[in-house]
Amino acid sequence: ATGGNILPALVAYKQFPGMEGAAYYYFGMPKNTVNDAMVSRHYTQFKSPPDFFTAGGFSAAMAVVTALKKSNGDASANTLIKTMEGMSFDTPKGKMTFRKEDHQAMQNMYHFKIKIDPAFAWGVPELVREIKAEEMQIPIRNKR
């Protein structure tokens, strides 16, 4: 991954059309109703698109809301741990799942190529391919 895919960092990418990389979020890539709503509201309130910190915070909030619904509001640590292990939930990126073995949030990634669009002050990550979470062999390194 190229790292640093926050909007201010993408300004420098405008110098590198055709550069390829990977990201876990760019507001124009996920095609789902949750992302559409978040992007629309973010533009309305802030007059700019959300970056991956916004999507990450939104995803964390969705995880908590989903867990509390599934636990009937029981917010005790042990109940939430059991509830969230293996739990899937909707996010701006699409479905995420907490892997039971190590609590890793398994999520899709995006292979992109930078294109230049005069409407944006930054190099635009254009989707080449969505890499499904199931395709990635993320090791489990804990001894649980």
Where in this protein do the model-derived segments appear?
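Extracytosolic ligand-binding ectodomains
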Residues: 1-144
